[in-house]
Structures are given as C-alpha cells and as structure tokens.
C-alpha cells in the first residue's frame, strides 16, 4: 500500500505557509490576519499530519490586533531555525509594522516583538548562510524602472540577529520574473550547491498568483530568472480549475536530500467560489539542470502525492510504539475518481486536544479553549467567560458589521473596535455547525451564530427584538467599497437585509447551519432532535470573489448591544462543527 500526502495538508483559512526542519521535526507557521491569538504554529514528523502546537502571538507577549476589514493584521510570516533558536519575522498592520519574535521551543513561549523600525516594506524574510551569517530580505518600492519611478522589488541586507538591526543599506536584487509582473513579494533565499536561489510570489494572491525562481552565484549579485518561470501556477488552467490561486512557496530539504514546497492555494466550490479562503498545500520539488522543478511530471498541484520514502520508513518504525502522532494515519491513495473539489476534506483528529481541522466538539467544560478558537481582534475587556459549563458573551456596543475603516499602521490599542465573537475556521466544503444558546434580547441586543467573511460580508442567525416582538432571524450583511482598505481614498457603505424571520419567545434555542457548498440551510428548534427549517441562503453572496481572497470563512458565536454597552449576556451551552 503506497502511503500518500493529501492536499490540502492544512485545510481552512491558513495561508502564507513557511516551513523549516529541525532534525526529524517539521514546523510550519501561517498568517492569521486580524484573528487573535495570531500566527498559528504547527508540527509534523511526516509532512502529512500536522498538529497545532501554539500561537506565536498572544496576549502574553503583547500582541495587539484590531478588528476591521478582516484583511489587515499579521500576514506572510517566515519561520526559521538557527543555532538553538526559532525565529518568526512578520508584519503587523495593526501595530508598528515589521517585527521578530524568538523562542527556544517552537511550542512557546515566544518573546515579545522586537520591532524592526529600520526594515522597510512588507513580507520580510530571514536567511542564514552556511557560515552562520544572517541576512534579511523583503519587499518594497526599491526598483528603479529607469524613469525615476520606484517600482515593487526585492531587497537584501546583512543582518545582526542578536541586536535586531541591519548592517548596511539594503541592496536591490530583483524586481519581477516577468516584465511588469504584478506584486513581486514574499521572498525566500536558499543556498543550494553553487547558487543562491530566490523564490518569490508574483501576480497577486488571486487567480494570477504564481511562484517564480531566480538564482545567483553571489549573494548580492545579479539574480537571473528561471527561463521556465513561473515554476508553479494554476493561472493557465482557467477560472474553473478545482485548485486555484496557487503561489507563495517555501522550500524544505528532507534528511535524504529530497525537497518539498509548501504553498497556498484555494479549493474551488461549485466551479466559482472560494469560501474556505487560502489553504496550505504541498508538492515535491526536484532539481533539474540547476533549477527547482515543482510537482515533476504534471507541473501542477495534485490532490495526492506519494509520501516521501524516508518519512514513511520512519513512521512505520514507530507503529506499535505508542507514538501515534509520529506514526501518523496515512491515506492509502484509494480516492474515487471524479471527486474534483472534494478531496482534502479533513477526517479524524488532525488538530489539537478535542478538535481537529473542521471537527469541533466543545462543551465549555474547561477554562482553556482549544487552538481552533479565535477572537476577531484582541479582547481588551472581559466580555467573555466560561462558567458553569457554558460560554458567556456580553452584549457590548460593538457589532460584527460596523462600518469599515482605512487600514493603517500603529492603530489605537484600545477596546474601541473589539467584538464579542468567538469562532472557528470553516475547513470543509460541507460543514454542519450546531450550538445551543440561552438568551432573551432586550432593546437593540442580538446574539447567535455568525458566518463571517472579510469586508463586512456576513450571515447572522440571531435572536433579537423586531417591532416589539421576540424573533429569530437570518440577517445578510454586505459592503460596497471603492478600493481595498489599504489603498488611499478608501470608502465603504455596509448594507443589511433580513433574509428570513420567525417569532420565537423561548429563552433557549438550538441553532444549526448546514453548509453544502454554497447552499446554506438554516435550522432551529428547542432541541437538536426537533429542528425545522427557517430558510435556505446563498453562500455565494459572501464568498471571497465578492470581497477579495485574503481570508476565509469563520463561523462562531457572538453577542452585541448594537451601539450600546448592555449588561445582558448570551449563554452558549455547547458548540459542534462537523
């Protein structure tokens, strides 16, 4: 039986993967944008089965995150290991910009941020050469196009990792692989044989996303582009390819000398939508005539690959040893043909504690939440608590769909923009979410289940008061805007619409969302065994094609006073996602 790697290796909204190997262990970090805690870190022994071991950015090490459009925050981390220390270099658009955190143990604790005020631009990366010298590279408007105008390019500088400062001025080493290629970014450097290899993303992170390669014999020399660029993309496969938006790669060498790349991509739903956002995929890489060749033989990301033989042998040697995480639960490759868009659905406990990717069973019987849970923005007030085997969310004044604001660095560190919202990523194309809520709204208060995408595109299944009546209703929120929030002149207007409404007087209610692709069936009842349908909603109305594809769907529980701080609390007895 041939063991397999199944894509995506980390399903759901876990984009911009960066990977490193330390001995027999593999570690991977992803972007988290405006979620808190931030920058999830995963561990694997076989590249197939990943377990989250921590968040690098937490309340304990001074993490600030502001809820806004969903597309700000922290993005494009690079994870590296050198001389007994792990490094994550990243950009926080809700704080001072570029920073580094370090840890002796990748499971934490991670240091407080070392702010890199002398590091320009975004998507900074660290590189340690064979002699141990560190270098920093990044993305910025550094390339002179010959007309006196600076264009986006890649820069490189020697770096002092002990004092977190650049040694000398940054040197521009590359602009784009293709002439006037859009958005060259996310650079990583590798020293392989006689060459330094530069891997970047290009084309923007949507349909035209791509991986580009360049090389130089001298670190600060001229980097020649690979004549075969792009070395990986799906943009030539049309807008209905089941795997789309491929790019943003990082490479890792295995103990036997073989290579793999982790990269982001999206699964297409019903040939048009990408509600799950950008996920983490993997593919083999071989070296041919001095260049990296991604996914040899096919040149595209496959749903499955043969597992690395060296890791299969290591895992099989551990079977029966009791080390289940190291041995893994391999797939046998017997996936049915014609299941385009469906492969990669998580099965089993691939996550941490009680929950796997897309599998959550939460009865709130512990004060410690599992890694699958996230807040939207940092919670500054005590608007949530776990007591008496229930989650309690307070009806604070902020709502989930407040008017959007322009995105800037160094935002205000206050309670002004927090929300009482606790959510999990949607990791499966077909998902059922159910929860039990106890809540009697007054005034403008509301609470319930929310399906949240970026840019105020949301569904709320909520208990509220409407024209003096106690009701259950499904609300749709959308936003019209002129440019992305990180562009000058951003302006937007949020609209709301009642999709369905029914009277409901009881304090307790069970809420359910049955998501089957883009068909959202909304149900409710007194118990989970006595549910009836409220309506069927269209998931396409909030899919990333409407709002840009930076983030993915979050589903969770919320409470709000809709403009007023109230003393009422919504109580959630349990939550399930399957």
Model-inferred region functions:
Residues 1-578:
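Carbohydrate-active catalytic/glycan-binding domains of CAZyme proteins
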